[in-house]
Amino acid sequence: MNENRLAIDILLLCISCGASALAGFSPTASSSLPATNLTDIGFAPPKYLTEAANIPKTRRKRYISQNDMLAILDYHNKVRGKVFPPASNMEYMVWDDTLAKTAEQWASTCIWEHGPRNLLRFLGQNLSVRTGRYRSILQLVKPWHDEVKDYSFPYPRDCNPRCPLKCYGPMCTHYTQMVWATSNKVGCAINTCHNMNVWGSVWKRATYLVCNYSPKGNWIGEAPYKVGVPCSMCPPSYGGSCSNNMCFPAVNSNYLHWFK
């Protein structure tokens, strides 16, 4: 079928070592492996590095616009603040430029799988790709949230994709990464890829989204959040601050400026 007449979203699912999954015509990818302190691989601790943000605009190639950045972040926080059953420890998510930079590096490869492997030990990751007419970044993000229809809190008992070459059946790990209470930082990148290989098919033009999360979520055997009165179990570092049912950090904006 003509690529220009058919828009296809693909979400790639990766559990533990790289299975992929296809949910109808909406593929997405989620990755979570054992976590380790980011300082072990040269990242700054959760203090949000800003060195990349200080590079002059003329020297910095961007893989995402500020509008797309805000749309992704606002959508995540909207979803996180409205989980059911309600969360007692849901943390407000902020944009992290260091995570965005790692997402840039992977998006630029146009490889339809999770990576790079050395970072997947430390980060959560959701992927989405689309061919055909592209209207909005949320076309690539909303399918992650759509998985909520197959999710039974606290564990994804109904999510059991079958993965020979492609994966079929309900999946939930993109959604659970979105609403993992302690995953309070996200950074994403979007790239236009030409002749991208997606499960054996070559897409002449594909829009590829990579989102990295920290601290990573999707720990096996754990629920994404604790149930209870919103903000009743926030970490002490939040000082009791609560906004839209989420533990709210002492920040002046809900994202880290890409350029200062």
Curated annotation (Swiss-Prot):
Propeptide feature ranges: 22-62
GO MF: peptidase inhibitor activity
InterPro entries recorded: Allrgn_V5/Tpx1_CS, CAP_dom, CAP_sf, CRISP-related
Residues with attached carbohydrate: 37, 126
Keywords associated with the record: Developmental protein, Glycoprotein, Protease inhibitor, Secreted, Signal
Subcellular location, record wording: Secreted
Cellular component GO terms held in the UniProt record: extracellular space
Gene3D superfamilies: CAP
Start and end residues of each SCP domain: 73-213
First and last residue of the signal peptide: 1-21
Coiled-coil blocks: none
Family label: Belongs to the CRISP family.
Main function: Serine protease inhibitor which displays weak inhibitory activity against trypsin. May play a role in facial patterning during embryonic development.
Protein's name in the database: Peptidase inhibitor 15-A
Source organism per UniProt: Danio rerio (Zebrafish)
